[in-house]
């Protein structure tokens, strides 16, 4: 059996190896960037006591860039290398459509990062003296509310705009997301 300390060091190294320059994380080596990976990194690192400013540096900006024009959250956002817009990194658009599962993971990550970043500057914040990008939580709330189906649909939730309701979104788009969104609105 591997001692806990050795396991934690190896886990930290592995998580850090998945980190991308824009603060996002890939799901596995050679894999895609996904906000769910950021959520998993936060959960694992906090549970193991290995969450450091270096690990979360840039993550809040990445999560906020996943917000779509609708107010919901997509799986990822273009990086500066993928989207050359001549502007600041903040202008990188989201990659994909807003989705209930992604929104839940992104909001839970954002709330956690708001709490962690309160008085804990990350390395890039120390260098640039800028505050992390904010998510438009009011817009996210409007999008989340619009995902509830009509009475004829049983009042259930859909995961994406103009899609059918689905039972799994009772958690992602219903109880889980609204609880996290409410907490984030109170923290901000």
Give the location of each predicted region.
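An alpha-helical repeat/solenoid feature that recognizes helix-turn-helix modules
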Residues: 1-2, 26-54, 69, 74-139, ...
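Core helices of alpha-solenoid repeat scaffolds
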Residues: 4, 8-12, 56-60, 133, ...
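Amphipathic alpha-helical segments within extended alpha-helical solenoids and repeat-rich scaffolds
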Residues: 13-19, 63-72, 137-152
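Asp-box/WD-like beta-propeller blade repeats and closely related beta-sheet repeat scaffolds
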Residues: 5-36
